[in-house]
């Protein structure tokens, strides 16, 4: 049973007039953990920077631009406990134990993958284990019409217990590479290549993927560095005034890990969080 790949019956998404959709803006605010992670991000080690690319070189038929996609809470929501309205269930064997994985698909995923594959080299890059993610990709794209490559947890860099997706492992032109992920800290080393998206769990009225289609399809026609476009659109650095300060610190003189207190029960906004860090660590804003 564990070797059988279930056939996916795609759910019918409600029709949405794209012309009426608002422009995609990403999350309204960054999570507290993401702010702390980005403020403390250490430089990549020489060992990591000298890694060989995990992907084969492009062929002539490979699209010029690359779109890296996260899986969990970006394209799907999965659980080992039963989910209401699960689209499918599939078995995964891990350490000789069979688990049933319940899957919900984010609305408009099929349309998104189909359209993006016409314009981009699609790569799945997930912090999940290969035994689970590989099987899920086989179900989502059994004929490999959309997803060209897959990278998993072993391809991530572990930083303070977080799995970070260093895009240099792709061996692709950074000026033509983007990553879509619900966790900003996942692309912390290439912040300007990132497209942040709200985490998805169950909302059947979600249109985030559909909002992105026209925007992404237009990018290759502009002939510009994608980092300039995404930096201007999402302005992630505006949320993190410490980002450039921290990245100027290298070697023994680097600032120590910030011991930022956890947020109170009523979560503060980004400005309040930043004020908390500055008050506790004034050296960050000195000279």
Swiss-Prot record:
Cystine connections: none
Name used for this protein in its record: CTD small phosphatase-like protein 3
SUPFAM superfamilies attached to this UniProt entry: HAD-like
Protein family per UniProt: Belongs to the CTDSPL2 family.
EC number: 3.1.3.-
Organismal lineage: Eukaryota, Metazoa, Ecdysozoa, Nematoda, Chromadorea
Keyword set, alphabetical order: Hydrolase, Protein phosphatase
InterPro entries the UniProt entry points to: Dullard_phosphatase, FCP1_dom, HAD-like_sf, HAD_sf, TIM50
Domain FCP1 homology: 60-219
Biological role stated in the UniProt entry: Probable phosphatase.
Keyword Hydrolase: yes
UniProt keyword Ribosomal protein present: no
GO molecular function, a single term: phosphoprotein phosphatase activity
Coiled coil: none
Matching Pfam families: NIF (PF03031)
NCBIfam families reported for this sequence: HIF-SF_euk
């Amino acid at each position: 049973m564990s070797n059988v790949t279930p056939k996916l019956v795609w759910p019918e998404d409600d029709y949405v007039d794209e012309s009426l959709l608002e422009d995609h803006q990403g999350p309204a605010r960054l999570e507290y953990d993401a702010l702390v992670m980005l403020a403390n991000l250490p430089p990549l080690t020489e060992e990591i920077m000298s890694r060989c690319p995990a992907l084969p070189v492009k062929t002539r038929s490979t699209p010029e631009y690359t779109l890296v996609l996260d899986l969990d809470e970006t394209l799907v929501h999965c659980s080992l406990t039963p989910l209401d309205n699960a689209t499918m269930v599939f078995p995964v064997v891990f350490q000789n134990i069979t688990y049933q994985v319940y899957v919900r698909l984010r609305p408009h995923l099929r349309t998104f993958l189909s359209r993006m594959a016409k314009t981009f080299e699609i790569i799945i890059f997930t912090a999940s284990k290969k035994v689970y993610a590989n099987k899920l990709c086989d179900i989502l794209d059994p004929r490999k019409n959309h997803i060209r490559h897959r990278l998993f947890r072993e391809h991530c860099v572990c930083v303070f217990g977080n799995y970070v997706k260093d895009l240099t492992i792709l061996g692709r032109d950074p000026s033509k590479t983007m990553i879509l992920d619900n966790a900003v800290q996942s692309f912390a080393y290439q912040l300007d290549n990132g497209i942040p998206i709200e985490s998805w769990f169950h909302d059947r009225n979600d249109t985030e993927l559909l909002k992105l289609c026209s925007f992404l399809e237009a990018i290759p026609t502009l002939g510009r560095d994608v980092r300039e476009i995404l930096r201007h659109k999402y302005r992630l650095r505006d949320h993190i005034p410490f980002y450039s300060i921290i990245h100027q610190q290298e070697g023994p003189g680097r600032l120590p890990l910030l011991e930022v207190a956890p947020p109170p029960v009523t979560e503060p906004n980004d400005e309040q969080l930043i004020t908390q860090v500055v008050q506790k660590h004034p050296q960050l804003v000195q000279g």
